[in-house]
Amino acid sequence: MSVSILIPQEWELSFSAGTFDANNLFMGGSEVMHIVPHKNKLFASIGYWQDENNIWYGGSDLSIGWSQVICLENEDDDWQVDLDLGYNHLRPGILKQVIFTRDYTGVQLNSPDTLLIAGAFSPNYISGIVSANIFIRDDQDGTWNQILVYEGDYSSEESYSMRDIEIFMDQVTGIENLIVSVGTQGIFSGKYNPEIDGKIEMVTLPEFGPLGTRPLGITTANDQLYFSSGSKIFKRNDGIDPNYEVVHNFNDLSSYVNPSVGGVRGLSTVPNPSGQNESLILMWCPDGQSKGIIFRLDPLEAQVFDRVYETKISLLVEDYLPGETVNYLLGAYNEFYAYIDPLTNAQYTMIGIESLIQENIYPSWNSYYSGGIIVLRNNDGQYSIQEVNGAIDFNDDPLVSVRCYVSSPFENETAIYFGGFDPNGHTSTNNAWIYKKNWNSLDLDAQNSNSAAHYNLKNNYPNPFNPSTNISYSLSKENFITITVYDLIGNKIKLLVNDYKSIGNHTVNWNGVNEKGVSVSAGLYLFSIEAVSY
């Protein structure tokens, strides 16, 4: 009889900016903005904001502009450039996979068509014209087709930032729409047309707009489309001539929203605690004093929502970094990402953040905490904090911000990829990064296993625990025993036992601190036991 187990491994750096691919194309950048699986490959969008390789910041190579899309074909390959947007298009605010199931008339396709779409805008300061475009990958030959979404006169007072797209089926007409946000210009829509290059036919006028603040998120909940703009959440009223209405407003919390911070960020959908329907979830970040408050909106009747406070992320960070003060916190760059922990099968949603700190106790980069912090939310609305590549040291390269995260699309790999960095207005050359956390699957022959037959790890008690817990185990044979505490994504937290143990029952106490003697945040932790017979 054989069994398969997952073993948490150490973190692995997947991409570091400032290298060349197999075709000698430069891959740099100050930030990884998205990581997206598409047709058994992995794609990432790279921005060159504040990067000195960018010709707009003093770079000498005209081929290096604002943005690239890079590709990883399998887990053992190296990343390579797949699309270079040049020096005219600013950084790609959109990289997303969408799946069309119907054409522009509403007729169901014989088979769904899965497309990878990037989005960016291009201001021409000489002509005074700005255009916003989407780029659709042709998976047959690896090229990208450019489609115009918006074109108009450029104004420094307006935003043309493209931050999200969403496939949505109109519940009245049955037509599938590609919904695209273009800054303060509004919400645009397109339909699937396989007869044209790029396969998407955009409508030149917005469905809704202009807007006061650039939208930062679009989501579908309970078959309704919602998007955020500043302090407001809008709902689409379906039909031949759709319109939008405000269904929730956070202006009671702040009368002013700094457009560069955004207001409502990461608008996403989570299960309603009642067990029926879906709720909206978001991070509230209105201005330079933002502390990253998480709210859940539970739907009531007639498009009324019950606003539920879940947590303030800055307080979690201050608990995680004892003695530190968080002056500003930003996060939820994209969506609240849902995933299932491969070790426990528990369901979580994940966001990344950055924190401006003031006490100079911990490693920092231009006063931002250097570590890449991940915030996990379980289905009970409980939150915990973890770090990419473990707790950062003063000698480590700064990560600063976790912007994106996705499960591996590769058949032979159980892993989660994380990407990020955020220049925050500071010079940031070749700081973009991608790490992955991998779990290896090991097949063991239970009949021939020496270690599995000779020890038994029991449930810890008390559980839940505060501040300490006891772990009991028994040995039927003398062994060298290692017992280690891990967090949910495989970071090693604390080595509890690393010694030769005799036959019989044993107990070890964990006082809830990590290897550095710092108390860990509330959450779920895993115990691993290994035995080597002599």
Which residues fall in each region the model found?
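Structural motif
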Residues: 52-71, 124-136, 185-193, 230-243, ...
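Structural signature of eukaryotic scaffold interfaces centered on beta-propeller domains
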Residues: 28-38, 90-113, 158-175, 214-222, ...
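Conserved blade-ending motifs and adjacent loop-strand segments that build the rim/top face
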Residues: 311-335, 382-410
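Entry beta-strands of beta-propeller and related beta-repeat scaffolds
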Residues: 40-45, 49, 103-124, 171-180, ...
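Blade-level signature of beta-propeller repeat domains, shared across WD40, Kelch, NHL, RCC1
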Residues: 394-442
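Beta-strand-rich domains and repeat architectures in extracellular enzymes and scaffolds
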Residues: 20-65
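Blade-loop segments of beta-propeller domains
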Residues: 62-116, 120-121
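C-terminal outer-membrane/trafficking sorting elements
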Residues: 447-534
